[in-house]
Amino acid sequence: IYPNAECSWMGVAGLVNDARGDPIIGLYVQVGNFPDGEIRETLTGLFPIYGESGYEITIARPVMEIPQPLWIQLLNESHVPVSEKVYFKPSNSCERSLILINFKRVR
């Protein structure tokens, strides 16, 4: 996606689709459990480079070791969770600086 980024950027991105595979646009995506307690947020549909419901959140600039797993969660327009928190451990490898996490509604 970002061939010239090298080690200058680390993030999580993906798509959110319904059970039929249609894009769900306008959900909040949050990433948390940063050492300083920060929660970062974006909306689905803002990053069409990944697809119609694409999202992206920067984790670090430059790529660095993140000491603990982070979580990602979807919320509706009222900020009510519509998914569980999914934990993931970012890699400090420059070749693995983009983490792709896709969500699919199952009911």
Which residues make up each language-model segment?
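Short, acidic Ser/Thr/Gly-rich low-complexity loop/linker segments typical of extracellular
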Residues: P35-A60, P81, V86-F88
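Exposed beta-strand and adjacent loop surfaces of beta-rich binding modules
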Residues: G11, G26-Y28, P69
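Short, ordered, surface-exposed loop/turn motifs in non-cytosolic proteins
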Residues: G21-E38
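Extracellular beta-sheet/turn segments enriched in Thr/Pro/Gly and aliphatic residues
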Residues: I1-N4, V82-R107
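A short, solvent-exposed beta-strand micro-motif common in secreted/extracellular proteins
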Residues: I66-E77
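Predominantly extracellular/luminal cell-surface or secreted proteins
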Residues: N17, G32-F34, L75
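Beta-strand-rich domain onsets/edges
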Residues: I1-D22
